[in-house]
């Protein structure tokens, strides 16, 4: 019914599925046609991500099923990739494709490409897509694994033959099951040079050892490390070089292939087998020497039309249990398939168990059995043939769940989801660990030929957020919330009717749609492909591995050009000791009401490495310093005491890599300014960001003591130069800008960080500070060796310097208007404080810095503290989140979030936080002297049981220190003014409903007016006669609470996409959820009071 009460029919649905987008490279793409919108009078906008949704009133279920059968027949052709061109079919055209996945397998040698070969051999497998959108599987033959050892002095051809025989014998003993005719295929004498340390001779003799299979490199290395008995030389152990390089990376380096680039195989250089091994449209075999690798420039910088599948599953769990694949069915799978670079998906469907009411613009596919649902999804994967599979937490939950569920049901044909025939999906537990990211537990699902991109993993790596739920991440990046239905309600919706299952389908589709939106918004595909191109590693390495593999890849490439080899580093952890970090000049804390100019070093650490030629191959050992007698003008002694040769003797590899990266970044930024096409801009922006990150990670690679090639002599030299430059900058500024030097005021450096200094020139206006800042940067840059450069970038005015690495100020880059309020190390940007602290600090800084109203800021703090003590603060503002980096038993000191996670595990192990998750909690009232870890509690549990919060904990442990840091420089007696006084004397504590001793308490009636205990009735004797006044007050209170609850309820309905369905959302990351729950409780209590009136 519409507002006027007249029933209106909704328009019938379209009989045709959404059109498939055109297949082309994204360099010149145009969006697919959008679905037409309908008049607002006909319907509410129910599905936020769709144009609209509707229910079909006139069609019975039988006609819907008949139409569905007709539509299914056309799906395969609508979903299929474009057909191969005649030139491809006749082998008369070179095959050019963008490779996305690259791995290696062990198989029989290709007799036609490698005549005379026999037995097993390593084969490189590359999957990709042509410009036309055809899928490619390329088998590359002939590339062999190898590594190096230094040739012992005096070893000749006969000795090498004896060495070969000894090594072959030991390898045969170690690899008894290998089906190869020869384990050590060749040992050759080659002229190379180790990258470690400066050497005057141009090269030395190495032995290149080529083995039959990649796994044999490690076993051969182990034999040589332990020692080998050689005729004529006795027992000898060897230092190996490049024996820890992954086979795929070795292949890419030697063939000059980088991740995500375009590969060409010329006509006549590839062979097609009659019996194909994959489902790809183009499958062929070639020799590695026939591959042409194209640099990512011009046409070859564009992206192929990759097919991106975003999916989500819903499972019907048992009451009180989180879904488990051994017991609980998969009831819905939502799928969106988009061509990379296009705005609209060309496949939009949801597969449901049992009937589901139609959804406009969505192909609803209903099935009677779970087996049919799972096989339909398997068929979709086969027909659509996605290159990239995305979702949110798919690696840890969705994909493993589907595989295990299919195994439980005995569906043997389900796990054939990859591009290789008869190859089943494999799932194993995995743990990712790095100093930057901490420890994260996950699962590794191998789907051969398809790149899995889990958005939760990418966002974890690239962004620091207080919560990583899909709802919270979507709110942060897309300003869009979603309904979050608790797993316990999903089963009820499934067991309802077609309408409730339709609601579940809309929810499931939203969970498939948001990851696609995030992928586009954060330009993940562009950024990751460009990072792979810049660093030379496969795209899949970027999510699965840390930073060091990227630098190692660049070192190997540059080393190959220079005929250098990398030693296999043996030291770990503490063997090399530690080094002193960067300098932070003493902070002259206070509130500065005059402009503060900031002078920043451009790419400081990379610049130092380039300026002073710091590298593995330019480092001179203390012994060689004495022995080589190098002229002083050709060496540099660093402030940390290390010696490096200058470029006049030898240019370092690391400085060369850095020069190329920074030059390429300048070029990419210049091209970005000129670019007009949005897709070209996305590629160039991704490239310049990748180049910047890569340049900055080179220094970290040398300082990682557990890395591939640590060298603390380099990293300690870099930081010592950095310290020296910060101190030199301070001296030069304060010596030059003085009244004696003709300036109006004496300049003062008030703070210096790793790569920047803050200067107060004494002038009162921003423009004058900017002029002096530019002059200072130019003057000081002239005293440093190029390319070290000091730049003037910004002015802070006013500026609140709290202490080291903690400050806030208004940032100006032009004198007319400030750009933003910039903070560092303050609770506005820290993620382990509750939202109340962040909001209060932000409000205070706004009033102090922007409004220049310190008394107003103080009054706002007092009011907030009073609200906290009187229990008037939303619970959502008091939630603290901390990352769970290990299990409770592994923590040396008990922590609030660690102990809560253990308690939640005892309540419900399935929904309890795991290692790597962030745990939300609040601190509750408890016995005097109880520790914080004993008082942490789950916010939902607190709401459900009306457990009182401990306001004093929040005042003393969360609010007081951040506030005093801000107010002490601007407010006299800040502690007394803000934390003591009349506003702190009244405290209200909630009575718990059913926890602790309250389980045994007997409730006592109290007077509605004055709250004194009474035996019956509504009012005490003293309040009799005030019935009208108190009743009206009670009615008014109920009406007010109903209005508050109604507004919150409507807000939640709008978020879920329907104004005529109950709200089911229980999102822990949404402040509205906590407010709605509290309003509902308050309203129920007020109604109980009202019901006590007997008239």
Curated annotation (Swiss-Prot):
GO terms for cellular component: delta DNA polymerase complex. It is an enzyme of class 2 (transferase). Binds 1 [4Fe-4S] cluster. The keyword 4Fe-4S applies. This polymerase possesses two enzymatic activities: DNA synthesis (polymerase) and an exonucleolytic activity that degrades single-stranded DNA in the 3'- to 5'-direction. The CysB motif binds 1 4Fe-4S cluster and is required for the formation of polymerase complexes. This is DNA polymerase delta catalytic subunit. Its cofactor is [4Fe-4S] cluster. Gene3D superfamilies: DNA polymerase family B, C-terminal domain, DNA Polymerase, chain B, domain 1, Helix hairpin bin, Palm domain of DNA polymerase, Ribonuclease H-like superfamily/Ribonuclease H. Keywords: 4Fe-4S, DNA replication, DNA-binding, DNA-directed DNA polymerase, Exonuclease, Hydrolase, Iron, Iron-sulfur, Metal-binding, Nuclease, Nucleotidyltransferase, Nucleus, Transferase, Zinc, Zinc-finger. Belongs to the DNA polymerase type-B family.
């Amino acid at each position: 019914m519409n507002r006027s009460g007249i029933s209106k029919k909704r328009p019938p649905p379209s009989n045709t599925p959404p059109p498939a987008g055109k297949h082309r490279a994204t360099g010149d793409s145009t969006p697919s046609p959008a679905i037409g919108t309908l008049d607002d009078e006909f319907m509410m906008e129910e599905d936020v991500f769709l144009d609209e949704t509707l229910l079909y009133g006139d069609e019975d279920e039988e006609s819907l099923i008949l139409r569905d059968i007709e539509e299914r027949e056309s799906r395969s052709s609508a979903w299929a990739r474009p057909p191969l061109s005649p030139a491809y079919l006749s082998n008369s055209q070179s095959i050019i494709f963008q490779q996305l996945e690259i791995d290696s397998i062990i198989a029989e040698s290709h007799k036609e490409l490698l005549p005379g070969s026999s037995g097993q051999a390593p084969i490189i497998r590359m999957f990709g897509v042509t410009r036309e959108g055809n899928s490619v599987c390329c088998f590359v033959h002939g590339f062999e694994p190898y590594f190096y050892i230094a040739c012992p002095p005096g070893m000749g051809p006969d000795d090498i033959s004896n060495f070969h025989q000894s090594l072959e014998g030991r390898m045969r003993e170690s690899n008894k099951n290998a089906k190869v005719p020869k384990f050590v295929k060749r040992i050759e004498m080659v002229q190379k040079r180790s990258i470690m340390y400066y050497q005057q001779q141009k090269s030395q003799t190495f032995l290149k050892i080529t083995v039959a299979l990649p796994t044999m490199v490690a076993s051969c290395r182990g034999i040589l490390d332990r020692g080998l008995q050689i005729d004529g030389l006795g027992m000898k152990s060897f230092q190996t070089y490049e024996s820890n390089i992954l086979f795929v990376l070795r292949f890419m380096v030697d063939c000059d292939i980088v991740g995500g680039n375009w590969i060409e195989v010329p006509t006549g250089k590839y062979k097609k087998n009659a019996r194909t091994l994959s489902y790809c449209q183009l499958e062929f075999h070639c020799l590695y020497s026939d591959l042409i690798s194209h640099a990512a420039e011009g046409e070859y910088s564009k992206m192929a039309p990759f097919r991106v599948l975003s999916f989500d599953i819903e499972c019907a769990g048992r009451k009180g249990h989180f879904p488990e694949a051994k017991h609980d069915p998969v009831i819905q799978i939502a799928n969106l398939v988009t061509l990379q670079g296009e705005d609209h998906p060309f496949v939009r469907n949801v597969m449901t168990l049992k009937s589901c009411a139609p959804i406009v613009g969505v192909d609803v596919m209903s099935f009677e059995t779970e087996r049919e649902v799972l096989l339909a999804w398997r068929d979709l994967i086969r027909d659509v043939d996605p290159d990239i599979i995305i979702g949110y937490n798919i690696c840890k939950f969705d994909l493993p769940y589907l595989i295990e569920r299919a195994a439980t049901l005995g569906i043997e044909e389900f796990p054939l989801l990859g591009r290789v025939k008869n190859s089943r999906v494999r799932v194993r537990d995995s743990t990712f660990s790095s100093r930057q990211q901490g420890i994260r537990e996950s699962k590794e699902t191998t789907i051969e030929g398809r790149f899995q991109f889990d958005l939760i993993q990418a966002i974890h790596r690239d962004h620091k957020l207080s919560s990583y739920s899909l709802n919270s991440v979507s709110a942060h990046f897309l300003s869009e919330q979603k309904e979050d239905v608790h797993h316990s309600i999903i089963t009820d919706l499934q067991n309802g009717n077609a309408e409730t299952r339709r609601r579940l389908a809309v929810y499931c589709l939203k969970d498939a749609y948001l990851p696609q939106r995030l992928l586009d918004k954060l330009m993940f595909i562009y950024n990751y492909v460009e990072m792979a191109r810049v660093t030379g590693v496969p795209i899949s390495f970027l999510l699965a591995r840390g930073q060091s593999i990227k630098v190692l890849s660049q070192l190997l490439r540059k080393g190959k050009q220079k005929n250098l080899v990398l030693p296999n580093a043996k030291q770990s952890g503490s063997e090399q000791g530690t080094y002193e970090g960067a300098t932070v000049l003493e902070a002259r804390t206070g509130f500065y009401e005059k402009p503060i100019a900031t002078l920043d070093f451009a790419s400081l650490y990379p610049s130092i490495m380039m300026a002073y030629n710091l590298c593995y191959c330019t480092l001179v050992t203390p012994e060689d310093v004495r022995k080589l007698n190098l002229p002083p003008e050709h060496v540099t002694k660093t402030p940390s005491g290390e010696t490096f040769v200058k470029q006049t003797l030898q240019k370092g590899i690391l400085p060369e890599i850095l020069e190329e990266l920074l030059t390429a970044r300048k070029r990419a930024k210049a091209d970005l300014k000129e670019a007009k096409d949005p897709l070209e801009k996305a590629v160039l922006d991704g490239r310049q960001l990748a180049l910047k990150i890569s340049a900055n990670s080179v220094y970290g690679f040398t300082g990682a003591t557990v890395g591939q090639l640590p060298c603390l002599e380099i990293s300690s030299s870099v930081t010592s130069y950095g310290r020296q430059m910060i101190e030199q900058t301070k001296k030069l500024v304060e010596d030059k800008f003085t009244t004696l030097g003709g300036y109006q005021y004496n300049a003062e450096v008030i703070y210096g960080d790793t790569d920047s200094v803050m200067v107060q020139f004494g002038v009162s206006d921003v423009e004058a500070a900017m002029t002096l800042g530019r002059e200072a940067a130019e003057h000081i840059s002239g005293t440093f060796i190029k390319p070290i450069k000091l730049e003037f970038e910004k002015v802070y005015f006013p500026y609140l310097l709290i202490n080291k690495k903690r400050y806030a100020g208004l940032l100006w880059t032009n004198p007319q208007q400030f750009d933003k309020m910039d903070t560092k190390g303050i609770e506005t940007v820290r993620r382990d404080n509750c939202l109340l602290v962040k909001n209060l600090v932000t409000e205070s800084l706004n009033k102090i810095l922007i409004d220049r109203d310190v008394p107003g800021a103080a009054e706002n703090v007092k009011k907030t503290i009073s609200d906290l003590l009187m229990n008037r603060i939303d619970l959502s503002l008091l939630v603290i989140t901390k990352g769970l980096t290990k299990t409770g038993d592994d923590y040396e000191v008990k922590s609030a979030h660690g102990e809560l996670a253990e308690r939640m595990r005892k309540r419900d192990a399935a929904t309890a936080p795991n290692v790597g998750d962030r745990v939300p909690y609040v601190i509750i009232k408890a016995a005097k002297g109880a520790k914080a870890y004993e008082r942490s509690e789950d916010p939902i549990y607190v709401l459900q049981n009306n457990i009182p919060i401990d306001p004093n904990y929040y005042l003393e442990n969360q609010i007081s220190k951040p506030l005093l840091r801000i107010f002490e420089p601007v407010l006299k007696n800040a502690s007394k003014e803000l934390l003591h006084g009349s506003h702190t004397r009244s405290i209200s504590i909630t009575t718990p409903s059913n926890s602790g001793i309250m389980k045994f308490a007997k409730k006592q009636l109290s007077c509605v007016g004055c709250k004194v205990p009474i035996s019956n009735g509504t009012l005490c004797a003293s309040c009799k006669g005030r019935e009208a006044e108190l009743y009206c007050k009670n009615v008014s209170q109920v009406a007010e609470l109903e209005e508050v609850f109604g507004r919150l309820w409507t807000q939640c309905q709008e978020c879920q996409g329907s104004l005529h369905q109950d709200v089911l959302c229980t999102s822990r990351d949404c402040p509205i959820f906590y407010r709605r729950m509290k309003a509902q409780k308050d309203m129920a209590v007020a109604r109980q009071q009202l019901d006590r009136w007997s008239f």
